[in-house]
A protein has these predicted regions:
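ABC ATPase C-loop
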Residues: 43-44
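ABC ATPase "signature
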Residues: 110-111
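Walker B catalytic motif
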Residues: 55-56
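Helical segment within the ABC ATPase nucleotide-binding domain
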Residues: 65-78
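Hydrophobic anchor residue at the start of the ABC signature
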Residues: 39-40
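Conserved H-loop
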Residues: 80-94
């Protein structure tokens, strides 16, 4: 079980005020950004070897997006977690080791970011799966 102190630290890590969220039922009043940050805190509470995030940047503000990138980097570098990030955001794509491009529901290309990224310039695809793997 998580102690109150651990919960406070996790919420603080993702920029949420613990006093607002601990010992209170979350009743649907959270913004999209707050909900994303709460989801990240939940993942941080019990780290896994592999974490998958589908468009983690959706519905969040610029500050939350920066915090999200920082948390992903920490999860990868410090906690040695592999991440699969499904995103169209250039910043998320650039932080990936490998990219898989999906077009028409099929894999169009997959490989190292340095090899695939130049092919993506000026193009759109159904989705990009960005992989940070160990």
């Amino acid at each position: 079980d998580l102690t109150r102190d651990v919960c406070c630290r996790l919420l603080s890590t993702v920029g949420l005020c613990a006093n607002e969220y601990i010992e209170r039922e979350v009743d649907g009043t959270l913004s999209g950004g707050e909900m994303k940050r709460l989801e990240i805190a939940t993942v941080l509470a019990k780290p896994h070897k592999l974490c998958i995030f589908d468009e983690p940047e959706a519905g969040i503000d610029l500050w939350s997006f920066s915090m999200l990138i920082e948390q992903f980097e920490k999860m990868y570098k410090e906690k040695k977690q592999s991440l699969i990030l499904i995103s169209h955001q250039e910043r998320i794509i650039q932080m990936a080791d490998r990219i898989m491009v999906i077009e028409g529901g099929k894999i169009a290309s997959i490989g190292q970011t340095a090899d695939i990224l130049p092919q993506l310039l000026g193009k759109t695809a159904d989705s990009y799966s960005c992989l940070k793997c160990r």
